[in-house]
């Protein structure tokens, strides 16, 4: 048996967690550069906001319903996600973090102590008590069925936020009323293709010929069908595979037109990518930098390009990665308004593969110690120590005009209470 714990409106819920005044108010969160709606709580959905709505188009709805709007605060969301995971891991020994707001749990052995429904309610209550985040919990024989149960838990209030189904008749009833689009991994194109075969509900898919499904759509959807029948095909991944690449990129708040500004942006991306690389305890040999204009602009000259450097010796040193990212100069073109840039790291290896006795190049002396100091200082506050090449006054930085404080990672952001 598997449980899926999914936070309701994660980003919006994180914003409400430190703002009691927003408890009964509609809340929505915007994408990068405050462009589109990417998260909504229940009241914001009820007011008519939809995922992907452009902010400028829905401002009348926002003003009419007094909806609280926030820029995306990824630092806060990542911190709250870690707290959410820690609570669940304190109650279950086998946990897989599927996304920032979703965790799978292996429920093996749980029924010896309590019912699955009681376990689901305990998970939900402990997460709420320790983080204020409200979750939906779905429990079933397979991960795909647990996803369906979670959908039911979040859709119908009468469930109390928990649906645990091991009864064939009740599962069939649920599958008969849910459209096939609710199945994990079934996208819009697959849904349309299935409809032409007469498969419109989840139950229709569960009853489909697995050989035909495999021939038409591939082995992954065939396994999904088997999961709908109660056969576990997707196991719990407690230790996700190591990343094959790291990408740090941003769309700019305003167009970048000078090489100096772009070099500062790329230096910042390279520094952040190197930090992520060290967090993964990996080393890289390939560093790429890319720049592009907006594909949606009819006024700007269209241009996109990428430059790549391959190192002789793998590194995780920010200085080396930043230097390699200066390959930007090879692809830079003047008189162009750039909308986005980024740095990608690839060809990863562990520390044991860093040295090659036949190479003349060797890592910088004291590199690891210096990077450890850099990371240690920056753990106490973002960008407490940074590279001069990143610049100070980044007018081109991502637009986040409604950014909330970093309540959980910055002492200066903790609200002050006064007792009189």
Swiss-Prot record:
Pfam families referenced in this protein's UniProt entry, alphabetically: DUF4113, IMS, IMS_C
Gene: mucB
InterPro entries hit by this protein: DNA/RNA_pol_sf (IPR043502), DNA_pol_Y-fam_lit_finger_sf (IPR036775), DNA_pol_Y-fam_little_finger (IPR017961), DNA_polymerase-Y (IPR050116), DUF4113 (IPR025188), Rev_trsase/Diguanyl_cyclase (IPR043128), UmuC (IPR001126)
Organism whose genome encodes this protein: Escherichia coli
Protein name, UniProt field: Protein MucB
One cellular-component annotation, GO: cytosol
Function text: Involved in UV protection and mutation.
Miscellaneous comment text of the record: The mucAB operon is the plasmid-borne analog of the E.coli umuDC operon.
Residues passing through the membrane, by range: none
NCBIfam families, alphabetized: PRK03609.1
Family designation: Belongs to the DNA polymerase type-Y family.
PROSITE patterns: UMUC
Domain annotation UmuC: ranges: 2-187
Molecular function in Gene Ontology: damaged DNA binding; DNA-directed DNA polymerase activity
Keywords: DNA damage, DNA repair, Plasmid, SOS mutagenesis, SOS response
């Amino acid at each position: 048996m598997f449980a899926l714990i999914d936070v309701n409106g994660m980003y919006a819920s994180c914003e409400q967690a430190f703002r009691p005044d927003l408890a009964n108010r509609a809340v929505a969160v915007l994408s990068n550069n405050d462009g589109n709606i990417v998260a909504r709580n229940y009241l914001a959905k009820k007011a008519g906001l939809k995922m992907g709505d452009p902010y400028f188009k829905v401002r009348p709805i926002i003003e009419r319903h007094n909806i609280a709007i926030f820029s995306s605060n990824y630092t806060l969301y990542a911190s709250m996600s870690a707290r959410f995971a820690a609570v669940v891991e304190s109650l279950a020994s086998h946990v897989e973090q599927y996304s920032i707001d979703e965790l799978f749990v292996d429920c093996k052995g749980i029924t010896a102590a309590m019912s699955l429904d009681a376990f689901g309610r305990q998970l939900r209550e402990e997460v709420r008590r320790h983080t204020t985040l409200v979750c939906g919990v779905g429990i079933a024989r397979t991960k795909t069925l647990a996803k369906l149960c979670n959908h039911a838990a979040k859709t119908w209030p009468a469930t109390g936020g928990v649906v645990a189904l091991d009864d064939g008749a009740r599962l069939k009833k649920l599958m008969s009323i849910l459209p096939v689009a609710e199945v994990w991994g079934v996208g819009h194109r697959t849904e349309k293709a299935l409809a032409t075969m007469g498969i419109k509900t989840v139950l229709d898919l569960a009853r489909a010929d697995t050989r035909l499904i495999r021939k038409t759509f591939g082995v992954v959807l065939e396994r999904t069908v088997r999961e709908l029948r109660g056969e576990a095909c997707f196991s719990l991944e407690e230790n996700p595979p190591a990343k094959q690449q790291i990408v740090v990129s941003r769309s700019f708040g305003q167009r970048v037109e000078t090489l100096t500004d772009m070099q500062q942006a790329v230096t910042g991306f390279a520094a952040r990518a190197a930090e992520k690389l060290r967090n993964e305890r990996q080393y890289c040999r390939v560093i790429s930098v890319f720049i592009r204009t907006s594909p949606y602009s009819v006024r700007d000259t269209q241009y996109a390009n990428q430059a790549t450097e391959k190192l002789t010796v793998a590194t995780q040193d920010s200085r080396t990665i930043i230097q390699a990212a200066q390959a930007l100069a090879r692809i830079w073109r003047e008189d162009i308004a750039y909308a986005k840039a980024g740095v990608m790291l690839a060809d990863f290896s562990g520390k044991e593969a860093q040295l090659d006795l036949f190479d003349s190049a060797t890592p910088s002396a004291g590199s690891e110690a210096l990077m450890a100091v850099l990371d240690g200082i920056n753990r106490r506050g973002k960008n407490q120590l940074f590279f001069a090449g990143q610049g100070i006054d980044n007018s081109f930085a991502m637009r986040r005009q409604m950014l909330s404080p970093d309540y959980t990672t910055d002492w200066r952001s903790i609200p002050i209470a006064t007792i009189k």
